Structure formats: C-alpha cells, structure tokens
A protein has these predicted regions:
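Domain-level signature for soluble enzymes in the chorismate/prephenate branch of the shikimate pathway
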Residues: 1-356
C-alpha cells in the first residue's frame, strides 16, 4: 500500500459518491410526479432518523445528518424548478442522452435500462419525453425500437440527427503507450475495429459505451481505456486520447423524441388514425429545405398493398428515402417510410390523407 495507491482508491470512491448523489437527486425528481409538493416533513424526518441510526464512528452524527439536510434541500430546489424530463436508454453519457440535450438543453435527462422502459415511462407520465434511436447509417434500423413504435400510442414530437464520433478515453495522466485493453459496447468496438487492431489493443465487450467510460473512471483498471463519446469523457472526467477513431466518418444516428401528444409546433402524427407515426421534421425546421418526415402505415399481407402506398407518394412527386415493412401479427404489416418534405406542405398533407 502506497500513498499513490491510496489516492487512486480515494479517487474511485469519490467518483462513486458523485454518481450515487446524482442518482439520488434523479429519484427525488421523479417523486415530484407522485406528490402534491416538494416538501414532505414526515419523509424528511424518516430519512434523517435512519441516517442518524446508521452513522458510523468515523463520521460524526451531526456531520452526516447535516450532509443529508443539504442533499434534501438541493433535491427540493431541483424539484421546484419543474424541469421537463426526458428519458433515454443507457447510462449517463450515452449518445441518447447527448441527443436529448441537443433537443432540449434545459431539460433533465433520466436513464433507463431498456428501450421499452423509456416508452413505459412516457406513457405513465413519469417523464415528459423519451428519446430513442431509430436508424444508424452503418448499423441500419434499430429493430427493437421500430417493433415498439408499431404498437405504441405515443406521438413523435421531434427528431435529432446526430453524428456519432467515437473517442478513446482514459483516466487523466494515463500513458497511452501502456494501454492494452479497450472496453466498449460491441457495436462501437466493431465500428472502430481498424483503430483497435492497428494499435494492438484487445477489445472487451461492455454493455454500454457510457457504462464502459464510467467503469474506467471509477475502477481505473491498469492499462485499460474505453471507447465512448466526448460527452461521456466530460461527464466522467476522462482524458480524450484520440477523437474520431471510428472506421467510417459517415456514422450518424437518427433519434425520435416521443411524447403523449405531439408538440404544438407539429400537426400531430402522420397516421392520425393510430396516433403513432413519424417524426415531422427536425424540431424547429418545419417548412425549411432539408426537412425529413417519417410515417408508418398498416396494411394487410396481400399483393399490391405496398405498391398502393408508394404510388401515392410517387404521384405527388415526393422523394422516399427509406422503405421498410415489419410484420406486426399474422397477416398484417407495418410499412415505415421516410421522405423529404415538411408536414406543413400541402402535397405532403394530401399524400398522407390518401395513403392513410
């Protein structure tokens, strides 16, 4: 045991404390939806009593109870701000969270383990919005998300198209020449394969890019790094050894922002009969060149069903950029389409009415 090793241990503990503090404040923010106000004196007394009973000899009781009073005061202050809440899949620092912050910088972001949990949280009113990836230029459509989109009653309130730039991250001061192992999600590892092989690194599959970054920040395994976003590096205090290490520069992900109701800036979902269709252009870009709309139609599994939908858009002179059919149940299909245009264009409105 040396001074250096003890300080490394302290750094790891500090990182965990900060992560747990953030998690506690998030849970407090979620409770705001289930009570009439931020102040609950009975609950506060219960928490302080439990803290007092569990105080250990190294931590004075007055210190621990005072600390928790400050934490609860901060929690109440955050709740009183009545922030919009956006749920995303993954851990803090995930690309989904970066997309959420790009769409609504003032909102609070809430992590969920599964895509389905994001949908459920919006439906339950626990969060105002959910953001999910629907398509990646390298990996194609996100099948799990599209399968849920077919059946959900949520509306798409907006979209974010984001460049995905992978970074090699390590603890500050780490010697990059000593790096031997790199942790990340399997998809990120595959997208950076040439860089990994060229530098003689061993890729280790992790459940999440942001999770890998957090592990490196908290555990600091010797000779190890993570592949994650610049956002994750800033969040976990990691050093960016190398930016843009993905094999292909054309790596972009499109995200949908989900809500119970479409935002006022939009005209509602493209398939108004079902209340669950596409994105109506990037938020704030309606009616401008470069708008991109998405819609989903439901059709029987019979000859000519797909052609009937596509013919409408061809006759209207609307350029389709994506066509995909997904089976929903025996004999039925959902047809996903993306097309250039705005949901405020007269030609688009008429085409959607005819196709729907």
């Amino acid at each position: 045991m040396t001074l250096e090793s003890l300080r490394r241990d302290i750094d790891r503990i500090d990182a965990r404390i900060l992560s747990l503090l953030d998690e506690r404040l998030e849970k407090g923010l979620l409770t705001r939806r289930h009570k009439s106000g931020s102040l609950d004196s009975g609950r506060e007394a219960e928490v302080l009593g439990r803290v007092s009973a569990r105080s250990r000899c190294l931590a004075d009781e007055a210190f621990t109870t005072g600390l928790y009073r400050r934490i609860m005061d901060e929690s109440k202050a955050i709740q009183d701000r009545r922030l919009s809440l956006i749920g995303f899949q993954g851990m803090h620092g995930a690309y989904g969270e970066a997309a959420a912050r790009a769409w609504a910088p003032e909102a609070a972001t809430m992590p969920f383990g599964e895509f389905s949990q994001v949908f459920d949280a919006v439906l339950a009113g626990d969060v105002d919005y959910g953001i999910v990836p629907v398509e990646n230029t390298l990996g194609g459509v996100v099948g799990q998300v599209n399968s849920i989109l077919v059946t959900t009653e949520l509306r798409v309130a907006g979209a974010v198209d984001m460049a995905v730039s992978h970074c090699l991250l390590a603890p500050p001061g780490a010697d990059h020449r000593e790096l031997r192992t790199v942790y990340s999600h399997g998809q990120a590892l595959s997208q950076c394969r040439r860089f990994i092989e060229r530098n003689g690194l061993e890729g280790v599959d992790w459940f999440d890019t942001a999770g890998a970054a957090r592990m490196i920040a908290e555990e600091r395994p010797k000779g190890a790094a993570a592949i994650a976003s610049r956002f994750a590096a800033e969040l976990y205090g990691l050093e960016i050894i190398k930016d843009g290490i993905q094999d292909s520069p054309n790596n972009r992900t499109r995200f949908f922002v989900l809500a119970k109701e479409a935002r006022q800036a939009t005209n509602g979902p493209a398939d108004g009969d079902h209340g669950r269709a596409g994105d109506h252009g990037r938020a704030g870009d309606h009616g401008k060149a470069g708008d991109k709309c998405s819609a989903v139609f439901f059709a029987d599994d019979k000859a000519g069903a797909l052609f009937a939908v596509l013919e409408v858009f061809a006759e209207a002179g609307i350029n389709l950029t994506r066509i995909e059919s997904v089976p929903t149940e025996p004999g039925d299909y959902a047809i996903f389409i993306d097309f250039a245009g705005s949901d405020r264009d007269e030609a688009v409105i008429k085409a959607l009415d005819r196709a729907g």
